[in-house]
Amino acid sequence: MPGRLNAYRDVAPPGRVDLLQQLSKQVRGQRMLHVNASRAVGGVAEILQHLIPLLSELGIQARWEVMEGTESFYEATELFHLGLQGLDVMVSEALVDGYLECCRTNARSLDLSADVVMTHDVPPLALVDEAATDARWLWQCHLDLSHPQRKIWSLLRPYVTKYDAAVFSLPQFAQPLALPQFLIYPSLDPLSDKNRELAPEELDQILEKLQIPRDKPILLEVSGFNKFTDPLGVLAAYRRVKTHNDCRLVLAGSMPTDGPASQRVLEEVRDAAAKDEDIHLVLL
């Protein structure tokens, strides 16, 4: 069976690709729809960019729909994400109403016809209210839901319970729910550019383009700009290291697109790094 799947034979456990091909015969021809809030930014988008072609190669009719959001929608979902991961946030009734209205609007504009619909994280969560009775709806939560803020979880839990099943990244990230729960452990595509070896000349070209000198050791942090990746904590760790070993810090991450809270974190990082020429902020 030619195709991209065969490229994984060198990195997957022996027999795993053959097993996937055998198992796929049971669901071949099934229509599977994934729904999230971005086609280009974030971990979910990265997963789906690689997953959709593999599902299609296995004979599953895989599609990917992306929600269209308003400013209030993205502000609400950002606060929901922060609250679900334990931060104390306040979400106004107007933001909640804006989120739900945006979900209703997307339910009318998106093609939700499928045998299985998998929504990712909070943005498409409330789409389940428009679920077709002949489809199975799964909610995949990529967040740590172990200690959610009670008010936020109480608000969103009724939508989660309408799903046929939920998917979490680790057992300790899940919540007690009266529906089947499954685990899909976090992973990176071993064949993606993130795992590709860079030749020394490529490294030199990249550092030269970014105007980062190679006169001292480099510490590298690649992550988003939010409270949970804690870039200010990374700066503090770098400064502790620097008292013993002179070095540079490269703090690389994508431009925040999920709401004002992440924008504020980025501004705090800029302010904290402004007077240190050995800190290099790279926005991808």
At which residue positions do the language-model features occur?
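A conserved catalytic-core segment of Leloir-type glycosyltransferases
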Residues: 1-31, 49-113, 175, 184-190
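Conserved donor-binding/catalytic core segment of Leloir-type glycosyltransferases
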Residues: 33, 207-229, 235, 249-250
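Short N-terminal targeting/anchoring amphipathic segment
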Residues: 33-39, 106-123, 138
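Short donor-sugar binding/catalytic loops of nucleotide-sugar-dependent glycosyltransferases
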Residues: 38, 213, 222-226, 241, ...
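Active-site proximal beta-strand in glycosyltransferases
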Residues: 116-118, 129-147, 164-167, 181-186
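Donor nucleotide-sugar binding/catalytic pocket of nucleotide-sugar-dependent glycosyltransferases
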Residues: 146, 157-215
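Short hydrophobic signal-anchor/transmembrane segments that target glycosyltransferases
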Residues: 230-246, 272
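Nucleotide-activated donor-binding/catalytic signature segment of Leloir-type glycosyltransferases, i.e.
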Residues: 251-284
